[in-house]
Amino acid sequence: RVTRIVDTFLEHARIWYFGNGGNPKLFLGSPDWMRRNLYRRIEAVTPILDPNAKQELIDMLSIQLSDKRKACFVDENLRNCWKSAHPQKEKVRSQYTFYEYLKEKTE
């Protein structure tokens, strides 16, 4: 599933996460898999091999995937489908949560 976050900060990083039967494989890259990008540009993708870096990326993805205010997923017809929040649960806005996460790590 493709999840997009459309909010204050412009983001272009692509993270691919494959469960791989309990042994997660993560990759970082620049392409967004559009035809013009794959055939007319040079794009790069690299595996994440360091266990600490891998865990940090998984933590970051967890924050982003919990977004219930500015996140949407792309359906099979390439339409944006906005996530709906449960009325009783906190409505996470991941870019601000992510900012606080990084701020705490640097203090």
Q: What are the functions of these language-model segments?
A:
Residues R1-E107:
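PLD/PLD-like phosphodiesterase catalytic module centered on the HKD motif
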